[in-house]
């Protein structure tokens, strides 16, 4: 399993539906997958990044995709399309980085220096 390496500081979810675990939500939107499996059972303590929220595998608008990812337990949201108007809207409507994510990214930055 990709999350088992405790030395990994970052990991990424996928927009895959694991029907035996969560019939309604892709992994990126699934609290059950993120909280119960990745965080608790596997014990991943790093920053969890969503896959690109502009991918066609997701059926909602960008803001909804971002919020659903964060509410499920992702710490950061990946948006790769680079559309300025959409990026501005995301910045205005999606919550700021939480303390856990700020601390972990700061630790990672120090590690890179």
Labelled PLM ranges:
Residues 1-101, 107, 111:
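Second-shell residues forming the walls of enzyme active-site clefts
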